[in-house]
Amino acid sequence: MTTLYDILGVNPEADEGDLRKAYRRLARRFHPDINPDPKSHEYMARINEAFETLIDEARRLEYDASISSNRFYREGRDSPEVRPLTITLMQRLTAHRTPVYSLSFDATSSALVSSSFDNEVFWWDPILPEPVRRHRLEGGSVAAVRAIDDEEVVAVGSSENNVSFWRLRKDKSTSWRLTNGEWVSCLSIAPDGSALAMGTVNNLLNVHEAKGGKARYTKSDHTDSVTALAWSDDSRIIATGSADATVRLWAAGSGALVQTINGVRSTVTAIAFSPASKYLAVAAVDLSLRIFNVATGELHRVMFGHKRPVETLAFHPNGWLLASGCREGCIRLWSATRGVGQLNLPASNLPISTVTFSPDGNFLVAAGLDRTIRLWSIRASEADE
């Protein structure tokens, strides 16, 4: 494949001076005012495209990511930038009878909780093939679960503009429902279980208290549908992604706008914070994965590799390893800090809806429309930037 670097006759490490020098040399040779060849217009158009892309730092970063999108490595053998990584499929859990939409580990006991389209919530010991407990939630349609501790799980779901919330403690369920007034497009529960955020097709972010459903605030800064939500691990920041190709960060308690990120080129499909909220991973319809610095909003890395849009993202506790699940049925693992693909895991022939890591980092779990929960053991090095 001929790259833009090949067109200009420079190597991928070329700096601005090298690019300008190469462009001047080629323009003197191929410009239509100088070169009588009928194809000189075509040659010069390709030279202009190459130069304009590579001289722009953001566009060059995206281009570099696109041409390296198929480079996935194992065990760091192929590239000095790739961190050691070992992963082994341990279990296929098949007790769910309908698509699985949400997974959550309990941070205190490492028990896994899953929920499916039929509102069944299962508790799993990761080393056992059958659920250790189950409970069916009544009313509504569960979209997300969050394990708060070894005794409490909260869940949320929506149907058109109706939102349902459940709190399940020792198999005793309490719930509330509200009519939102807007068609709900996405939902997310705070890690501490104190609140839930909902995005609407009419551009709104609504945040409600988990206890009783009291409205905390509504924000209308987006100019198109809110399509993705994420909370920071400490429940202090909410990220909203939108069809307006922006991401906004909000103070979860007050609703104050903290940061607006404009470096996304298309509709946002998934968002995830890294541990300690250093990075924000953003997936978009253009099949890109972008890593932003949360404090500054600056673009850190761009990665490509998926063939269909990403539905779900999760960071490993080590802070550098990122998992993405997509509609093509695979999970890809990335070094988010280095911007390279680590591994491609073909999992299903149906979309992956949810992916997560265990709090100790020893397990990766994914599930989706094929009703199967897949659990891998994983060994990854600690962060070392």
Question: Which stretches of residues belong to each language-model region?
Answer:
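N-terminal J-domain/J-like co-chaperone modules of DnaJ/Hsp40 proteins
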Residues: M1-I34, R46-A50, L54, R83-L89
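WD40/WD-repeat beta-propeller blade N-cap
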Residues: T94-V100, R136-V142, L178-V184, S220-V226, ...
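WD40-repeat beta-propellers
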Residues: L103, V121-D125, V163-R167, L205-H208, ...
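Residue-level detector of Asp-centered blade-edge/turn motifs that repeat once per structural unit
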Residues: A107-T108, D149-D150, P191-D192, D233-D234, ...
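Hydrophobic beta-strand positions that form the internal "hydrophobic ladder"
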Residues: L112, V153-V154, L196, I238, ...
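Conserved strand-to-loop turn within each blade of WD40 beta-propeller repeats
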Residues: S115-D118, G157-E160, G199-N202, T240-D244, ...
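Short loop/turn segments that connect beta-strands within beta-propeller blades
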Residues: P126-P129, L168-D171, A210-G213, A252-S254, ...
